Amino acid sequence: MENQPKLNSSKEVIAFLAERFPHCFSAEGEARPLKIGIFQDLVDRVAGEMNLSKTQLRSALRLYTSSWRYLYGVKPGATRVDLDGNPCGELDEQHVEHARKQLEEAKARVQAQRAEQQAKKREAAAAAGEKEDAPPRERKPRPTTPRRKEGAERKPRAQKPVEKAPKTVKAPREEQHTPVSDISALTVGQALKVKAGQNAMDATVLEITKDGVRVQLNSGMSLIVRAEHLVF
């Protein structure tokens, strides 16, 4: 006998039962109420198939009959079915009421879980310093300048006259000279200046005579100059 694949979860077992007994079990949509004692029928019919154990079958049945879609199907006037889909009696009021309470409790548990999750999210957001978005600040409209009409001449911008700083004319610096008062104090080779009007020319003493001082200008010309025309 070949090894058969093993079903690992109750959902896989329910999918197998829906395929094996399609008139009794369903994988989706509203489920039909099951026959009382259907567990033993399953043990007898699927013994050895898919390596299913009684524990797996019992867990799968518990999950199937506690699902919302099964509890929705347990309502007044509904009929129980066996593995082949044959009717096995109408639901009594006690079973309908029990299913209604189970459904309400299941919904309440889900709502409580959602509320708890929302509270945890809010606490986490508060701990992280996240604040609700503040209302946007109203922006003041920027003053609009009147737009130039199409075809209107554009006025040239008035240019500000650039004020030029008045130029200061520097007066020529007048050289200060010291007149030679005693020619006997002069020495040959000494540098001095010879006054000629408003100017003074550089010169060198060549000889001191009784008539004055013989000097040589930078131009190479030599001449005798009296003391009143000599300055330092």
Swiss-Prot record:
Keyword terms, alphabetized: Chaperone, Cytoplasm, RNA-binding
Extent of Basic and acidic residues compositional bias: 117-138, 147-177
Family that this chain belongs to: Belongs to the ProQ family.
Organism: Escherichia coli O139:H28 (strain E24377A / ETEC)
Gene Ontology CC entries for this record: cytosol
GO MF terms held by the record: RNA strand annealing activity; RNA strand-exchange activity
Region of interest called Disordered, as start-end residue ranges on this chain: 105-182
Gene3D superfamilies: ProQ/FinO domain (1.10.1710.10)
Gene Ontology biological process: post-transcriptional regulation of gene expression
Superkingdom, natural source: Bacteria
Function: RNA chaperone with significant RNA binding, RNA strand exchange and RNA duplexing activities. May regulate ProP activity through an RNA-based, post-transcriptional mechanism.
Protein's name according to its UniProt entry: RNA chaperone ProQ
UniProt subcellular location: Cytoplasm
PANTHER family reported in the protein's UniProt record: RNA CHAPERONE PROQ
